[in-house]
């Protein structure tokens, strides 16, 4: 049995576990897993769609440039959220673990394990490309923030309401007026 055939046979199971583990990194993972409506759940649907496309590209042994669009979709979402870089990108490398779980447990697929080195290398390249995209997204966020600070708009968006500041000051000093 060839590796590509084994991956194709286990495609649905591998994708299901990979998407589940990725969505588990969110505090609202239950909602992300249940709702398939792209309008009610754009994050969950976009991540599932992106990971599915990435897996299919790995199966097709596609050129690295073909990975850019689905990687960009997933990484942009995770780059603007409160994840550390390692948390944001760990799901790409977890695919290795997911594949190993399905192939190491079956006697018929155990002979394929030595063939996983090539797949692991392609997954590593995919993860490195994801890191490049993540770094570019974070840099863009910081550049936007600096531009906002320079323009003075940050004063409007980050400043507390004057009446809220007065209430806080009263609480701290213990005065009622």
Where are these regions (language model features)?
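Core of compact, soluble alpha-helical bundle domains
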Residues: 1-71, 107-177
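Cytosolic, long alpha-helical scaffolding segments
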Residues: 81-82
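Elongated alpha-helical scaffolds
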Residues: 86-101
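Long, contiguous hydrophobic alpha-helical segments, chiefly transmembrane helices and signal peptides
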Residues: 74, 91-95, 127
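Short, charged/polar, low-complexity loop and linker segments
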Residues: 67-78, 100-104
